[in-house]
């Protein structure tokens, strides 16, 4: 859902989640920055977690991705960094200055929060704060090109993030617009709010509960994946242990695209615009061949390193891999993510879009469309310097709905 919608729908749910949670967040164990800033060291495995009574390593805590989001360590690497995995001291100093400024403006005002609390402290203690992006492969830290078929479906897809998009029915919106799902693996990456992750374990199972839309119940062992025709929004996951690392393989992710008008053939985008540094438009298709391999490793008593590789040969020309650090914070509170309840946005978009087109047909001046800024990178990493000037809204072509 676009920014104006989020502010209406989720104001209460956002209270003290993305920022105040830093107050009690434990300090991470650092993965040291090497001298060669293009080198990506392997995930450290020297820490040995305690075990559950049945012998599995115990990951069962509450974690948050807020640090990554608020520090603006983007999913896709800013082009200024090139193939560097790590920032320089000068670039890190700019990030630190921004974090200290954000912490200094922390406050709670009514149904919202401002600033952050404890962000600069996390950055001082975790070398992940010196990373240039979550994406580590391809080497440039950017998503690989789409295949011709993937590009065609991407360009013809529909969502509330598409400039000039007309809205006539619910199939003109993506799955997150409609509070169904953020998609997979998009649900596993930092968003602008509600970044909590809670792990539960029992013999033979691990449960990954996401604060925003989704709980994954994952068998551990050699159980077979579902047969091919069966699919779900979060896919079908199976896990096994490789030493101290939990490896989760996910297949059977709901396939489809956002260009079709058949609601049963719609699918979520694997990477979405509101991921911090994600991909524009929320219209990337998902084929039946899509799969992920996640490797979860506790690198210290208060951190998990999650390495996720996504492959979909019908959509992307190459697989891509991201790493992210989960910070343990057992005091982090999950609040109900009430998205459908009281939701009037989809109806309002449709009504406003029809009214706008009728107005233009009468020869009246069209409204401005401010969605063009979401078609390219719009998140800003303070490490690269001052942000570029904001683009000014342009007149719509008469197709614009309420998103403008």
Tell me the role of every PLM-derived stretch.
Residues 2-3, 12, 22-404:
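PEST-like low-complexity, intrinsically disordered acidic/proline/serine-rich tracts
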Residues 9-15:
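Sec-dependent N-terminal signal peptides
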């Amino acid at each position: 859902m676009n920014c104006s919608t989020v502010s209406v729908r989720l104001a209460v749910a956002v209270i003290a989640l993305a920022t105040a949670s830093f107050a009690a967040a434990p300090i991470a164990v650092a993965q040291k920055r090497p001298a060669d800033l293009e080198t990506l060291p392997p995930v450290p495995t020297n820490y040995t977690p305690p075990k559950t009574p049945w012998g599995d390593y115990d990951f069962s805590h509450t974690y948050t991705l807020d640090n990554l989001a608020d520090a603006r360590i983007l999913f896709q690497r800013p082009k200024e960094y090139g193939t560097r995995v790590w920032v320089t001291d000068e670039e890190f100093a700019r990030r630190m200055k921004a974090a200290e400024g954000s912490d200094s403006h922390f406050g709670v005002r009514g149904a919202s929060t401002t600033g952050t609390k404890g962000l600069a402290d996390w950055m001082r203690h975790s070398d992940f704060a010196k990373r240039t992006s979550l994406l580590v492969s391809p080497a440039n830290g950017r998503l690989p090109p789409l295949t011709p078929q993937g590009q065609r479906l991407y360009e013809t897809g529909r969502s509330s993030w598409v400039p000039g998009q007309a809205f006539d029915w619910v199939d003109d919106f993506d799955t997150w617009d409609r509070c169904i799902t953020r998609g997979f693996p998009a649900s596993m990456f930092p968003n602008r709010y509600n970044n909590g992750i809670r792990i539960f374990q029992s013999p033979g199972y691990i449960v990954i509960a996401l604060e925003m839309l989704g709980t994954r119940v994952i068998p551990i062992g050699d159980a077979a994946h579902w047969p091919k025709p069966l699919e779900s929004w979060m896919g079908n996951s199976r896990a096994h242990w490789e030493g101290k690392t939990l490896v989760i393989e996910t297949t059977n992710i709901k396939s489809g695209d956002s260009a079709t008008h058949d609601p049963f053939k719609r699918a979520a985008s694997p990477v979405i615009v509101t991921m911090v540094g994600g991909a524009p438009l929320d219209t990337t298709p998902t084929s039946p061949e899509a799969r992920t391999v996640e490797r979860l490793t506790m690198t210290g008593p208060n951190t998990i390193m999650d390495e996720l590789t996504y492959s979909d040969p019908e959509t992307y020309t190459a697989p891509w891999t991201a790493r992210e650090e989960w910070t343990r914070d057992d005091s982090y509170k999950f609040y109900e993510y009430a998205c459908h309840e009281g939701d009037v946005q989809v109806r309002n978009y449709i009504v406003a879009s029809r009214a706008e087109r009728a107005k233009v047909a009468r020869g009246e001046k069209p409204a401005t469309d401010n969605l063009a800024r979401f078609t390219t990178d719009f998140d800003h990493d303070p490490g690269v310097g001052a942000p570029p000037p904001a683009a000014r809204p342009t007149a719509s072509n008469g197709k614009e709905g309420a998103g403008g």
